[in-house]
Amino acid sequence: MLAFTLRFIKNKRYLATLAGALVIIAGLTSQHAWSGNGLPQINGKALAALAKQHPVVVLFRHVERCDRSDNTCLSDSTGITVNGAQDARALGKAFSADIQNYNLYSSNTVRTIQSATWFSAGRSLTVDKKMMDCGSGIYASINTLLKKSQNKNIVIFTHNHCLTYIAKNKRGVKFDPDYLNALVMHAENGKLFLDGEFVPG
């Protein structure tokens, strides 16, 4: 009887240890899924909540470019594909459901201008060639746009190397954006903070 009791106690301890280990593993797995590439994921609702506190800056990479795809071009061979234009329109519609009030900017390339135009479906677009130059000066350029926009939310269509630079510089993470991937920043007391990656939905 004593031997049975001792075995029962040991089994309970083993099961408790195993259960604890599984909880830890599950937590780590969940954290990894949440962080993905090391950036917090921000959906439309979270973005809208952030925009109520601070002016937000959303920087999108342009859509599928024509010169690197076998898909049908929208028009200019240096611009975007028809598929890319449709993707931009769909994303813009979903984005506007959460953020209605924003000013729109793009770099001075055909692909970013077309991406922004299809994303916005008629919203006024301002082209700024500084959104092509991505280094330490990018933050001053963004702050200039915020001032021009009188601290309204702004959406910028730019390039993958800009997003990669900001993610590395602000959070020390490697970010290799696909078409229409985006970063979310907010302005506070004249400074820009990287909040995470925009994930539609």
UniProtKB/Swiss-Prot annotation:
<keyword id="KW-0732">Signal</keyword>
<feature type="signal peptide">
    <location>
        <begin position="1"/>
        <end position="35"/>
    </location>
</feature>
<dbReference type="InterPro" id="IPR011310">
    <property type="entry name" value="LipoPS_heptP_Pase"/>
</dbReference>
<keyword id="KW-0378">Hydrolase</keyword>
<dbReference type="InterPro" id="IPR029033">
    <property type="entry name" value="His_PPase_superfam"/>
</dbReference>
<comment type="similarity">
    <text>Belongs to the phosphoglycerate mutase family. Ais subfamily.</text>
</comment>
<keyword id="KW-0574">Periplasm</keyword>
<dbReference type="GO" id="GO:0016791">
    <property type="term" value="F:phosphatase activity"/>
</dbReference>
<dbReference type="GO" id="GO:0008653">
    <property type="term" value="P:lipopolysaccharide metabolic process"/>
</dbReference>
<dbReference type="GO" id="GO:0042597">
    <property type="term" value="C:periplasmic space"/>
</dbReference>
<comment type="function">
    <text>Catalyzes the dephosphorylation of heptose(II) of the outer membrane lipopolysaccharide core.</text>
</comment>
<comment type="pathway">
    <text>Bacterial outer membrane biogenesis; lipopolysaccharide metabolism.</text>
</comment>
<protein>
    <recommendedName>
        <fullName>Lipopolysaccharide core heptose(II)-phosphate phosphatase</fullName>
        <ecNumber>3.1.3.-</ecNumber>
    </recommendedName>
</protein>
